[in-house]
Structure formats: C-alpha cells, structure tokens
C-alpha cells in the first residue's frame, strides 16, 4: 500500500518459521525499515528478528523500548514492566471481586523511545542527533 510517498508491505505470520521470508522479502524490495508490531509471537521470536535484520542491514523498529536494549535499532511505546504492573493491579482487583465486565480498559499513558546507536553503526545508519536528544534511553 502506498501512503504519502512510502510503500508499506504488510506480512502476517502465524508461526515462528514464517518470520524469515518476510524479512528476506524486505531486503529484496530494498525496504527502508522493518516495523515489527507488538504481538506475542513476534515478541517471542524477537531475537531471531533482531539477528536476521542486523545480518541483512535492515533498520528494525519495535513497539517495546526494551527491544533496543536487546540489539534492535529502535523501540517506541510503553515500557513492558509498566504494562505488567498495570496488568497485575487489574488482576488483583478482579480476584478481589471486581467484575471483569465492568472493569475499565487502561491505556498506557507514558511512552518511551530507546535508540541503539551501536546497532545503527553496525548496519551503517546514522541517527539524527535531533532524534537522539529526545530518546529516553540511548544504547552506545
């Protein structure tokens, strides 16, 4: 799909062994970057994705900032530990008798940006200093 001069290639995967081919296709299509959405499957296989994108020199962007600490290029979104704390509070309320049907849905209110400059250097990418100064975490 083309949006504002960019072409978005969307690939759904349902099993771990399906992760590699879309990354290879991104390289073959000279994709500018790979945006890895937050899903249990992709999170479980994040190390596979990180290794493969690094080997192919594809910039990788994740929905969890922690992924940049694990070797991904960039992560932007709620911190996983904050999400788990909120989930824990909701579970305690439900176990304490609150009805799940009447329980409000809590959206993250705090987002973080993590940039891995080491990964950027390894794949030959320069990150603009104007972006780096806004990062919550910079991995060098």
Language-model segment annotations:
Residues 1-140:
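Short hydrophobic alpha-helices and adjacent helix-cap/hinge residues
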């Amino acid at each position: 799909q083309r949006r504002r001069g960019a072409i978005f290639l969307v690939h759904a995967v349902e099993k771990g062994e399906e992760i590699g081919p879309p990354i290879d296709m991104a390289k073959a299509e000279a994709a500018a970057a790979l945006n890895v959405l937050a899903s249990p499957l992709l999170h479980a296989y994040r190390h596979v994705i990180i290794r493969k994108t690094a080997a192919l020199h594809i910039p990788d962007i994740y929905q969890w900032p922690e992924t940049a600490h694990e070797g991904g290029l960039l992560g932007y979104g709620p911190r996983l530990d904050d999400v788990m704390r909120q989930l824990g509070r909701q579970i305690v309320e439900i176990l304490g008798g609150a009805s799940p049907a009447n329980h409000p849905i809590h959206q993250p209110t705090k987002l973080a940006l993590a940039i891995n400059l080491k990964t950027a250097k390894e794949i030959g990418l320069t990150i603009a200093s104007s972006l780096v100064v806004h990062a919550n975490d910079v991995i060098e």
